Swiss-Prot record:
Entries under Pfam families matching the protein: Ribosomal_L4 (PF00573)
This protein's UniProt keywords: Ribonucleoprotein, Ribosomal protein, RNA-binding, rRNA-binding
Keyword Ribosomal protein belongs to the record: yes
Region (Disordered) residue spans: 67-87
GO biological process, one term: translation
Organism: Rhodopirellula baltica (strain DSM 10527 / NCIMB 13988 / SH1)
Protein name, UniProt field: Large ribosomal subunit protein uL4
Top-rank lineage group of the source organism: Bacteria
GO molecular function, one term: rRNA binding
Subunit note: Part of the 50S ribosomal subunit.
Family the UniProt entry places it in: Belongs to the universal ribosomal protein uL4 family.
Function: One of the primary rRNA binding proteins, this protein initially binds near the 5'-end of the 23S rRNA. It is important during the early stages of 50S assembly. It makes multiple contacts with different domains of the 23S rRNA in the assembled 50S subunit and ribosome.
Coiled-coil residues: none
NCBIfam families: rplD_bact
Length: 222
């Protein structure tokens, strides 16, 4: 059981949020978190790298100079890999790095990541985060009041809040995601995670995207 202080937009504590971390995930598997994070990172790779073999670069195959009598080392084509502008000995071709782990494992990893951040005291809870119109300066001031200025922060909202998204996207190191789109990579990358109370309620009652049936049995099998 964890008790998290609930703060308002001015940084003042207005209550306590009680959450049972055992209900989120009964344990934290570093190996599973690593596997899922590496999967997300691999899926983000473009894989557009391309190098040319000596048979693909332009240039003649003619011997550069005669074999003997010049005093130089023996040399053949200009397109060999030891020459400037020549081909590459072991080429890299475009490829698709993406792969997929089981859905259940991915969802369990998301909940494990949330529990890990709670256990490490890296989650901040705000009672309400609402603006009348997109305003970057207001979000920046709220983050400063919460002690999150100049800190990489993930803001987790209950739903798709375009006002908060547009207000926070221009701040370096700040990302805004609805709670249903959270995953192990987005949760573990920033130094702090700012949850609205409503978003944390969805994590608590299991109505966010990372919830699964038979949590304890699934984690035991992971």
């Amino acid at each position: 059981m964890a008790n998290l202080p609930i703060l308002d937009a001015s940084g003042k504590e207005v209550g306590q949020y009680e959450i049972d971390t055992e209900q989120i995930a009964n344990r934290v598997s570093k190996q599973l978190l690593h596997d899922v994070v590496v999967m997300y990172q691999a899926n983000k790779r473009q894989g557009s790298h391309n190098t040319r073999t000596r048979g693909q670069v332009s240039g003649t195959n003619k011997k550069m100079y005669r074999q003997k009598g010049t005093g130089n080392a023996r040399a053949g084509s200009k397109r060999t890999n030891v020459r400037r502008g020549g081909g590459v000995a072991r080429t890299v071709k475009p490829r698709d790095y993406s792969y997929r782990l089981p859905k259940k494992a991915i969802k369990i990893a998301t909940r494990m990541a949330i529990r890990s951040r709670i256990d490490d005291g890296e989650i901040v809870v705000i009672n309400e985060l609402k603006l009348d119109a997109p305003k970057t300066s207001q979000i920046a001031q709220i983050l400063k009041n919460l002690g999150l200025a100049n800190t990489t922060t993930l803001i987790a909202t209950a739903g798709d809040d375009q006002i908060i998204y547009k207000s926070g996207r221009n701040i370096s190191g700040v990302t805004v995601e609805p709670v249903r789109q959270l995953n192990a990579l987005t949760l573990l990358t920033p130094k702090r995670v700012l949850f609205t109370q409503e978003a944390l309620d969805r994590v608590k009652d299991g109505t966010f995207a990372g919830s699964t049936q038979n949590t304890n049995e699934a984690e035991a099998a992971a």
